[in-house]
């Protein structure tokens, strides 16, 4: 939405029809994602278990990943670099594109939030007949062994953070797990303190 506000304040940008169309599409993409995310968080806070409503459709995963990366908000004081890798001729994925985008946004946001000033984020997509594998790796603070299972629990926040003022309520990874499992997929985590974190999501091609 910051892109849209900047656009409204820039007269020259508003005169460019192609730019206008792109900014409007990006803004609608972000609004749809925000609406779905807030709705899911409300469900998670208000109920212990509630069925996740998915609206699956076929979409280009590479295009979605690249859009999420492009629209990522980089906080002041952070220098963030991305690298991405995709298989050639990857078929469309049938899943809920809004929730998948939010899952990826959560992982990227965590990678930025729980890292130092210079952040390196690697996003790798693999594809086979069983499904798609999406991995997000970073060079952040890492997670202590005794906390690796707990980080997917609702409202859990690490006690090993070097900066106790990092904002958050502990719902991001809980949301990630719930959405992935609603797609009949799985999520796994590998991490070492001081060496970063790698989170891998597997979604079956025949899940929906």
Predicted features by range, described:
Residues 143-155:
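Short conserved segment of the HATPase_c
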Residues 55-70, 83:
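A conserved beta-strand-to-alpha-helix junction within the catalytic ATP-binding
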Residues 111-112:
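Short helix-loop "hinge" at the ATP-lid/N-box region of the Bergerat-fold HATPase_c
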Residues 49-54, 88, 92-95:
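Conserved micro-motifs of the catalytic ATP-binding
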Residues 75-84:
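Short conserved segments within the C-terminal catalytic ATPase subdomain
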Residues 29-34:
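Short alpha-helical segment of the dimerization/phosphotransfer core of two-component systems
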């Amino acid at each position: 939405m910051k892109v849209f506000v900047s656009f409204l304040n820039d007269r020259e940008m508003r005169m460019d029809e192609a730019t206008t169309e792109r900014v409007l599409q990006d803004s609608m993409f972000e609004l749809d994602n925000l609406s779905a995310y807030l709705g899911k968080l409300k469900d998670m806070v208000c109920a212990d278990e509630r069925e996740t409503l998915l609206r699956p459709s076929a979409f280009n995963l590479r295009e979605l990943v690249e859009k999420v990366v492009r629209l990522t908000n980089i906080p002041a004081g952070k220098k963030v670099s991305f690298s991405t890798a995709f298989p050639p001729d990857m078929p469309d994925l049938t899943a809920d594109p809004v929730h998948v985008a939010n899952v990826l946004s959560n992982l990227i946001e965590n990678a930025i939030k729980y890292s130092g000033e210079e952040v390196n984020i690697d996003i790798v997509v693999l594809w086979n007949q069983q499904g798609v594998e999406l991995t997000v790796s970073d060079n952040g603070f890492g997670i202590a062994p005794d906390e690796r299972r707990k980080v997917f629990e609702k409202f859990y926040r690490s006690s090993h953070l070097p900066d106790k003022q990092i904002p958050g309520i502990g719902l991001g990874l809980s949301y990630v797990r719930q959405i992935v499992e609603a797609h009949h997929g799985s999520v796994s985590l590998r991490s070492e303190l001081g060496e970063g974190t790698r989170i891998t999501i597997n979604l079956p091609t025949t899940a929906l």
